[in-house]
C-alpha cells in the first residue's frame, strides 16, 4: 500500500430493526468475493428500540497490497471529513451524519 492509496470508506446510518447490520454484512461479503480486503464495525445505539446505529465499512483492493504482503490497518470508527459514502435510511439519519461531520462537500456522496 503506497502512501497515496486509501481505502474506500462507507458509513450506513440506520435505526434499530431496519436491517443495517444485514446490509453491512452483505456489502462486506460482496467486497471480499470481488477481491477486496474489507472490514466493518458498528457503533450501536439502542438498536433493539429503534435507536440510531452507525455501521462503518472500509474496503481496499487486494491487488493494492504491497510487495511484502502487508495489508492495510483499518479504522474502527468513522472520522469527520474522511468518509466517501454515507447511506442513510431516513432523512433524520442523514441530518445526524451531517451534524457529526461525516458528510462533507469535498469528499462524501450522501445517499
PLM ranges: what are they?
Residues 1-111:
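Active-site cofactor/cluster-binding pocket
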Amino acid at each position: 500500500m503506497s502512501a497515496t492509496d486509501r481505502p474506500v470508506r462507507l458509513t450506513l446510518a440506520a435505526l434499530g430493526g431496519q436491517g443495517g447490520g444485514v446490509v453491512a454484512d452483505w456489502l462486506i461479503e460482496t467486497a471480499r468475493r470481488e477481491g477486496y480486503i474489507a472490514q466493518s464495525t458498528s457503533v450501536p445505539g439502542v438498536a433493539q428500540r429503534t435507536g440510531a446505529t452507525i455501521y462503518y465499512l472500509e474496503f481496499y483492493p487486494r491487488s493494492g497490497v504491497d510487495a511484502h504482503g502487508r495489508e492495510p490497518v483499518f479504522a474502527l470508527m468513522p472520522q469527520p471529513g474522511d468518509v466517501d459514502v454515507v447511506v442513510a435510511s431516513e432523512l433524520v439519519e442523514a441530518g445526524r451524519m451531517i451534524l457529526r461531520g461525516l458528510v462533507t462537500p469535498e469528499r462524501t456522496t450522501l445517499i
